[in-house]
Regions:
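Polytopic transmembrane helical bundles with strong interfacial aromatic enrichment
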Residues: 2-250
Length: 250
């Protein structure tokens, strides 16, 4: 009797669920996996970035030497592992999605060569990062650095819009600028922050004082990434939201 009741309900229930729930297939499955991976890795990366800047830096200033010797070797290697690999996954997956599904679609619609677009964009990203890297190696004043970084971001956005703006749509341009800032942040993580933090952790374990300029460079690079994350996240939002900041939505 009971089994018969379940059988009577199963058919209409299946029809209802079929109307309400639709599993991704084919190309849609690849897209959603890439986007989901990008979101999860980005949350890990940026979440730890904000933890470092808003919580860890003020806390470390209050700890004495013996306490740092206990806390830093336990906390920092693990946090930095998730931090740096979260950055790698975020950027690589984001680049894959951008090239395959956003820039390629836009380029096809306007009759442009997607590889030429991608190559020009990456070249601009790397040239501007080289300038940022030199600035981070030479500028020790946080306020001056903030001004320079702001000007660099504006100049970078202007060049990207000049190269892609005539035919680029809002998604291509928003992620072109925002994703470029994300690549800068990734390069800062591996090229400056992680390299410096390895030496700082080793010195702390050995009971020696790490060079002050090393800690300062790591701090300023991390703070720069925190600044860059704000326009980066804003532009990620405008690329898929209701606000069209650049180009067209064709």
């Amino acid at each position: 009797m009971l089994s018969g009741s379940f059988a009577d309900l199963s058919a209409p229930l299946a029809l209802i669920l079929q109307d309400w729930i639709h599993g991704p297939t084919g190309d849609a499955l690849a897209r959603i996996i890439l986007r989901w991976s990008h979101f999860v890795a980005g949350i890990v990366w940026i979440g730890i970035l904000y933890f470092f800047n808003l919580i860890n830096v003020p806390l470390m200033k209050k700890l004495d030497g013996p306490t740092k010797k206990i806390v830093i070797p336990e906390l920092m290697p693990r946090a930095l592992w998730y931090f740096r690999w979260g950055a790698v996954v975020t950027v690589l997956v984001g680049l894959t999605y951008y090239a395959m599904y956003i820039m390629s679609s836009n380029a096809h619609n306007v009759g442009a060569n997607v590889w030429a677009w991608l190559g020009q964009w990456l070249l601009v990203v790397l040239v501007f990062y080289a300038i940022l890297y030199l600035v981070l190696q030479s500028v020790n004043n946080g306020n001056l650095l903030a001004v320079i970084v702001a000007l660099l971001v504006i100049a970078f956005a202007g060049v990207v819009l000049y190269l892609l703006g005539e035919k680029g749509d809002n998604k291509t341009l928003s992620i072109g600028v925002g994703g470029g800032l994300g690549i800068w942040m990734l390069l800062n993580v591996w090229g400056i922050i992680w390299r410096a933090q390895k030496k700082i952790i080793a010195a702390t374990v050995e009971g020696t004082t790490p060079p002050a300029d090393l800690a300062r460079k790591a701090f300023l690079a991390s703070r720069t990434n925190a600044w860059l994350s704000l326009p980066m996240l804003f532009l990620m939002g405008t690329s898929h939201g209701d606000y069209q900041i650049f180009g067209t939505n064709k």
